[in-house]
Amino acid sequence: GGSAPAVLNAANEVAVAAFLGARLAFDRIPELIEHTLEGVAVIPLSSIEDVFAADEAARECAQLWLARNAEGVLQEPLRIPA
């Protein structure tokens, strides 16, 4: 409950973007999400500002994890046809 869904969503968005950008292997997506869920405090949400704050904290935590743990995994970013 609380801010956990916002944290989960933000971590997932960062992880998928990193995967599509060839910075994160697909099988490491859960690791990044788990780290973010453990690293960002879950708080009760009483306003939309609380949701935005949880999202921002989660994205920052996930980006820090990426900076320390990600490596170039693919030769080039994944291209998804339109």
Give the role of each language-model region.
Residues 1-82:
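Catalytic, metal-anchored helix/loop core of enzyme active sites in primary metabolism
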